[in-house]
Amino acid sequence: MPVDFNGYWKMLSNENFEEYLRALDVNVALRKIANLLKPDKEIVQDGDHMIIRTLSTFRNYIMDFQVGKEFEEDLTGIDDRKCMTTVSWDGDKLQCVQKGEKEGRGWTQWIEGDELHLEMRAEGVICKQVFKKVH
């Protein structure tokens, strides 16, 4: 049985986010705005089908996928690229590989207690975010 990621999560910390955005070639103005945001995550999980909504006052991003199946991810509004994305289970963690222009791009997501941990990677840069479950 997979881990239950269902819930609404509020950001607690966001380490190295601006460097991560720089590695994705996000322009300086957008990096500065994005770095000020504290987005929430709303996750709806039905077995291996997931919808992850990243919600902020500036922009929302919705990722709708089936674990284990590759899909084309449109990152318009983030770094305006498309990539082929696969999310898979690695024990109790979700591992995402995003194949495209940027080397080593992807993320890992897991739960510790009532906290959601998200580690995003691109071009050797790692950003660590932590969210607390609110419901």
From Swiss-Prot:
- Region annotation (Important for interaction with STRA6) ranges: 22-32
Where does this protein hold all-trans-retinol? K41, M63, Q109
GO MF annotation list: all-trans-retinol binding; retinal binding; retinoid binding
Q: Which GO terms describe its cellular component?
A: cytosol; lipid droplet; nucleoplasm
Q: Which UniProt keywords apply?
A: Cytoplasm, Lipid droplet, Retinol-binding, Transport, Vitamin A
Localization = Cytoplasm; Lipid droplet
The UniProt entry, under InterPro entries, shows: Calycin (IPR012674), CRBP1 (IPR031264), Fatty_acid-bd (IPR000463), ILBP (IPR031259), Lipocln_cytosolic_FA-bd_dom (IPR000566)
Keyword Nucleotide-binding belongs to the record: no
Q: Which Pfam families match?
A: Lipocalin
One Gene Ontology BP term is: retinoic acid biosynthetic process
The annotated consequence of gene deletion is:
No visible phenotype when mice are kept on a vitamin A-enriched diet. Still, mutant mice have impaired vitamin A homeostasis. Four week old mice have reduced levels of retinoids in the liver, due to more rapid vitamin A turnover. When mice are kept on a vitamin A-deficient diet after weaning, they gain weight normally during the first 5 weeks, and then stop gaining weight.
- What is the stated purpose of this protein? Cytoplasmic retinol-binding protein. Accepts retinol from the transport protein STRA6, and thereby contributes to retinol uptake, storage and retinoid homeostasis.
What's in the domain note?
A: Forms a beta-barrel structure that accommodates hydrophobic ligands in its interior.
- Family assignment from sequence similarity: Belongs to the calycin superfamily. Fatty-acid binding protein (FABP) family.
Record note on quaternary structure: Interacts (only as retinol-free apoprotein) with STRA6.
What is the protein's name according to its record?
Retinol-binding protein 1
Q: Tell me which species this is from.
A: Mus musculus
